[in-house]
Amino acid sequence: MMDDKHVNNKKSILFVINTMGQAGAEKALLALMNMFDSSRYELYLYVLMAQGEMIHEVPTHVTVLNKRYCDISVLAKAGRSNMIKTVLGALLLRGGLFRDFGYIVSNAFAMIRDRRFQTDKLMWRVLADTADRFDKEFDLAVAYLEGGSTYYTADYVNAKHRAGFVHIDYTKSGYTRKLDGGCYAKLDRIFTVSDEVRENFLKVYPEYADKTRVFHNFLNIEDIKKRAGADGGFADNYDGVRILTVGRITYQKGYDIAVEAMKILKERGVKARWYVLGDGPLRDDISRQIQKSGLEKDFVLLGACDNPYPYYAQTDIYVHATRFEGKSIAIQEAQVLGCVIAASDCSGNREQIENGVDGILFEYTPGKIADAIQELTENPEKAERMALAASQKKINNIEDMEHIYELL
């Protein structure tokens, strides 16, 4: 049991997150925790699912509250198997099935009715209801992701103040008021990572406009630039145009459309190769699509990578062809490293890229994606000019920290 007295009168802050896998929100959380002066703030971290390889990058001044932890990637097959075991344990061994049976059934029927069944959205409530409890009262508890971490923070954390982050387009995410069960009413502040994310969140929860603030993602820019110069990156000696995408292989990220765009580029005679850094549940599906399209040498799935930054530094074009977005850490990383960027014209992306100035925004069709890439390959001076503008973008908004300090 933790001592309830704050060490040296430091303010205590608990961060709660769903997993610590290698994804954008987790990277932003690590950068945010590094913003706090350890002589004034006592930081804690609780990982709801207790899994993810980025746990090893948690700053040394942060106390991890999980008693047991699995550092296998949440995207690897072994990691996904462990996640299933965790969910089954919550359902069967910790009484989650009995406790949340009505919630599961009613929301499952709602999903079926809406033709959008998402098992993970159902299970976050079960994981929150069966997670560890702590006696300590924190000065501030912060749920850093939607779903489980927000449910847990709202219902089970003993804190003087509570806040939650929203990183996604809430109108397209699959979360609903019924799933959320009133969790946002229990938070003192709601932080969205962009203006557009705030706008879309308030379409679902208009009554929380007064307590919703924009709090931009933080990045460790010095670390990104340092790691970009390390050994690694492309190893195939390809002499054509390299295209890079970094992100989980999920429906949201749109790799199925990207493969179709690559097929069009090949048919047009554009000498290019598209690389993907990342893993995910749809990897086998995308692999089959690649083979069916005859693109085995043209669209390459490299898998997850501990250090993606040499790839950013070495690529010719960074493409972010997502169906929807909150605020993309991958785009920000590409901007830090001065990449030529092309992205889909969707929520999130259009707030990060000024079309024709520091990147290209394209309509979300295979043909338009191919057009944007071809335009950049045929106009190197324009591409270089946009890459320079991208590298000069302001990334970190230090003044946003005041939104947290005012709660302490």
Language-model features, listed with the residues they occupy:
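A short, well-ordered alpha-helix in the C-terminal region of glycosyltransferases
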Residues: K266, Q291, K368, E375, ...
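Aromatic "clamp/platform" in nucleotide-sugar-dependent glycosyltransferases that forms part
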Residues: A304, R323
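Conserved acidic donor-binding segment of nucleotide-sugar-dependent glycosyltransferases
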Residues: N355-G356, I360-G367, E375-P380
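Short acidic/histidine- and often glycine-rich active-site loop of Leloir-type glycosyltransferases
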Residues: E333, D345-G356, I360-L361
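Donor nucleotide-sugar binding/catalytic pocket of nucleotide-sugar-dependent glycosyltransferases
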Residues: H161-H167, T171, A185-R227
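Short hydrophobic beta-strand element within catalytic cores of glycosyltransferases
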Residues: V340-A343
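A conserved mid-protein helix/loop that constitutes part of the nucleotide-sugar donor-binding site
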Residues: E26-A31, V241-I264, V270, P281-S287
